[in-house]
Amino acid sequence: MFIKLIQLIFLFVCFQLNAFAELKINTWETKEGAKVLFVENHDLPILDVNVNFFAGSAQDPIGKEGLANLTHHLMNLGAGGINEEKLANQFSDIGAAIGGDVDLDRAYFKLRTLSSAPQRDKALTLFKYVIHAPDFPAPVIDREKDRIIARIKQSLTQPETIANLAFMKSIYGDHPYGRNEAGNIDTLQKLNQADLKQFYKNYYSSFESSIVIVGDVSADEAKKISESISQGLPQGNTKHNIASVTAQNYVGVKKIQHPAKQAHILMGMPAL
């Protein structure tokens, strides 16, 4: 039985390696400077599109921590003149799904849709509303700020969050990587619609974006899709950077008292 299991695992690994070996990735750049990666695959009638931006929380201006996270969050809550409820329903009606996330370095949006032309075209139109024409409605901004602030307050009572924030601060000091990605209560309260619009304009440009297209479309169709995405994004040729990380000299043990019954231990050291 054990030998048969090993044989099955070996065959599976060989199959996977062979699949990766045959994977053909086409690359090009759009006229606006977006980098595109495309994998054609007709096994399933599915199309996946992922658009990445150099718009992570490390780009938050001092005094406006939480701006990157809030901007990304609001882009999907009303766009192209369509409110958040109708937008979600229209994606759902055609069996499409939109998602995304933001981290220290980057923000991204992803779309999964059926590849048949009617569903695909409708899904891409809605997707482009989100990344091309976010509305940033002021009442929704205020509502979501309150929700995020409530989550921050709750998280600051949890030992895991307290430990993670202290650990990152010990590693990165005053570098943007040492800050809370969600921001803090004081800075979030001050953010407004103009801040979000300006951050979107500065950091969601086609010049610093990358587009990944995988699935049941031809190369010509993928090029048309990538161009239509790239053309509608803010234009510009500004290349944003993140300050180099300076190694901290802190060595030792930091203990934080907490009434929780469990202990959280985080350890780290300089590495590549």
Segments from the language model and where they lie:
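A common structural junction motif
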Residues: 127-136, 230-237
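Short acidic/His-enriched helical or mixed secondary-structure segments at domain edges of catalytic enzymes
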Residues: 147-165, 249-262
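M16 family metallopeptidases and their MPP-like homologs
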Residues: 37-39, 44-70, 84-131, 149, ...
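Acidic/histidine-enriched alpha-helical segments
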Residues: 84, 88-89, 134-153, 218, ...
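N- or domain-start disorder-to-order transition segments that initiate the globular core
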Residues: 20-46
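Histidine-acidic residue clusters that define the catalytic metal-binding segment
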Residues: 22-27, 169-209, 241-246
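Bacterial N-terminal signal peptides
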Residues: 6-18
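An aromatic/glycine/proline-enriched structural segment found at the starts
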Residues: 177-181, 186, 208-272
